Structures are given as structure tokens and as C-alpha cells.
Amino acid sequence: MRCFRWWLYSGWWWLTFGCARTVTVGFVAPTVRAQSTVVRSEPAPPSETRRDNNDTSYFSSTSFHSSVSPATSVDRQFRRTTYDRWDGRRWLRTRYGNASACVTGTQWSTNFFFSQCEHYPSFVKLNGVQRWTPVRRPMGEVAYYGGCCMVGGGNRAYVILVSGYGTASYGNALRVNFGRGNCTAPKRTYPRRLELHDGRTDPSRCDPYQVYFYGLQCPEQLVITAHGGVGMRRCPTGSRPTPSRPHRHDLENELHGLCVDLLVCVLLLALLLLELVPMEAVRHPLLFWRRVALSPSTSKVDRAVKLCLRRMFGLPPPPSVAPPGEKKELPAQAALSPPLTTWSLPPFPSTRIPDSPPPPYQLRHATSLVTVPTLLLYTSSDIGDTASETTCVAHATYGEPPEPARSTATVQECTVLTAPNCGIVNNDGAVSEGQDHGDAVHHSLDVVSQCAADTGVVDTSE
């Protein structure tokens, strides 16, 4: 049972840490692994160009950290930095043009999905534009996070996550169309896509004039400011739609990458089952489970499972288990192993009490060398030289039925003591050898008299 628990815990740990993180499919917006890049597209006011303490690099690979020139720097180095900054901005304006357009239309969608964003370079921060207040104070930058993705209908468009790296309402998006000409509304800065390749920027392969703002709860939540920034506000009461279910094609794209992981998990489960289930259950399943159903059970769960197996195979129910109590011995066992209170001592006085009960009647008949039953005579350990117990041939009943009268030859056989260290007693009552102690002579005479009385023969030697 402990081995089975160990295998169970090992398998649970294997599946949890091997497959849990790969099998779980989250129904949330894809996480954008963005690489922040700041691109300057508008020059600072002339009054601030000479002593611009907030000078930033053109392409910062992490974020827009300011690199301030030291006050003690050489004037020539400052002029070169200013020239490079102006030259870089002029290069951006001549290549990409002004990033200003007007909003020509919007469309709200509750069943929007996109995919294949990872087939392009890492996501970048889009068109960060430094803005200034009327008193020549920097307002910050307008930044967008997103990428060129495949949207519904097989077209590629730019998708912006309005919530940054956080989760978003699945399926809700607002499409905003920008235009460069025939603008009745004021022009605003729109998110222009710049892809970063080895330090250089390339225009987006998606249409920059059609942008999807993904993750909104209602169309009124998005506000495009006059500077082209994106503002967020609360949705009106009752206008918040429920998030739609994930689209079928989007789920297929998410599950496509899990096929190999699921196959590995299935192989791990198969190996675990091969370790737990014996091969006999695979080769002969009917015989194996039938044998399991017929085997005795100890626990309640094991008994319930085997009862179900018996019902499946049409076997009779298992016998009822007796309540725990005192074990009752059978009559045969009680006769073979009597309790300690029924043991009887030898019928004559002895100087040593036996340490163990006498053997049964059948055992004494099987181990004796003569046909007459034997009796163990226990004497003092001071009498014998090597053996502490002397065995003499005599007749004892111990509850056996009395035997019929025997002939004189049988009496002569009873009077002969053949055990070692036991003197030979003649009919005259003399001890030839061995016994020097007086008690032993009296014991021998008593045994001979008892033997003669039992056989019914009268001693006529006197």
C-alpha cells in the first residue's frame, strides 16, 4: 500500500510540473512582448534647443531615459550632438512624412480576433511624440503598444492594446480609419508603425491608416485627444456589452502549439500506467480482475470495489465479515492444545516440576520404541551424570481407556528398566547397578508394584 501511494504521489508531481503549464489554455488577450523604442518626429521649440536638459536618444532599446549632457562638456561636443539630433529628425520627416491625419470613420466590433503577431519582429513603442505646453514645458510622449497582425478576413492590420501589458475584454475592438486628405476634422497624430532591424527603422508592412484599438469595454471608452493621444474614460451606465466567446480560428491557433505538449503528456501517462498496472492485467484482463474480485479485502474501499467487480462478473457476494471479538477455537484444536489448567502432574512425587506439558497421546505412541505407552520420570539433577531426566518404561493412562490384563511375559517386560542410568530391578527387589540413592530404590519398587497391580498379575516371588 505504501508503494502504491509513493507511485501515486510521484505521478501527480510528474503531471503537475510537466504538463500543467502547457495544457492550460487562457482565454485572454495575447501578451505583447514589446520592446520599447522612442522615435522623435517633431523638433523641440527653438528657445529650448540650446540648453535642452531633457535631451534623449533617438532610438532607445529599453525606454525613454534621458541622457543629460554634463554642464562642463565641451561646446563642440554639444554642437555635434545638436546637429545629429536635428539631422535624425529631418531624415525621419523626409522618409516617412508628417505623422498627422484626421479620423475619417470608426467601427465597433464585439467579435474581433487576431493572430500571427509573432511572425514579425519584436513589438516596439510606436511613434512616441514629444509634446509641449504653451509655456514651453514638456507634456510627455504619446506611445502605443501593438503589432502588425492577421485580422478577420485574411487582411493584415495594426492592432493596439489599449491596456498595455494587462488583460483586456476579449473580442471587443474599435477600428479607427485615418486619412491624409479631405479632412474636415482637425488632423491628429496617428500611430505610425516603425519596425526595428539592427538599429534601423523600416515602415510597417501593414496599412498604417487602419488601426484596431483592442480590449475596450464600450466604443465610448476610447477618446483621441487633439494631440493624437489615446485617452480612456468610463463607459456610460448600461452600455457595457458582455465579452463575446473566443473565436473558433483564434482557439485553433492557440491549440495548434499545444499538440506536441499534449502528446508528451499522453506518453508520460502511458509510462505511468505501465509502471502501476501489471502486465498480467493487459494480457489476461478477465482472469486478472476476476482473481482480484475473489481475493479477500481488508479496507472498506477495497471491499466496495471488489463487490462491484463481483457484480460485473456475476459472482456471488463475499461472505459477511464477523465483528472483531474473541476467537473461538474449534473442538479439534481445543483437544490438541488443552489449556494450562488441564495439565496433570506425574502420579508420584518428583523433585523437579516439568517446564512443558507432556506430549499428546498419539505423539507418545509414535516416538516410543515399545508397544506399551511411555511415561517421563523426572528426577533430581544431582542423581544423573549427564542426563537430568531418566526415562523408564511403565504404564500410565492420562485419560486413556484401561487396557486388558496381560500375561506374565508382559509383567516381566514391565519390571525391566532399560533407560540409561536406571537400575535393573529383579524380582527379588534388588538394584544391580546405577542407583545409589535410597529414594530411587523406593521409586522403582513403587513403579513395579503399580505395574503389577495394573496388569492383574500377583507377584509370587516372595
UniProtKB/Swiss-Prot annotation:
Location(s) in or outside the cell: Host membrane
Native source organism of the sequence: Human cytomegalovirus (strain AD169) (HHV-5)
Membrane topology: Multi-pass membrane protein
Keyword Mitochondrion: no
Location (main, coarse): host cell
Family designation: Belongs to the HHV-5 US29 protein family.
Keywords: Host membrane, Membrane, Transmembrane, Transmembrane helix
GO cellular component terms listed in the entry, alphabetical order: host cell membrane; membrane
Positions of transmembrane segments: 12-32, 257-277
Identification of the protein by name: Uncharacterized protein HHRF4
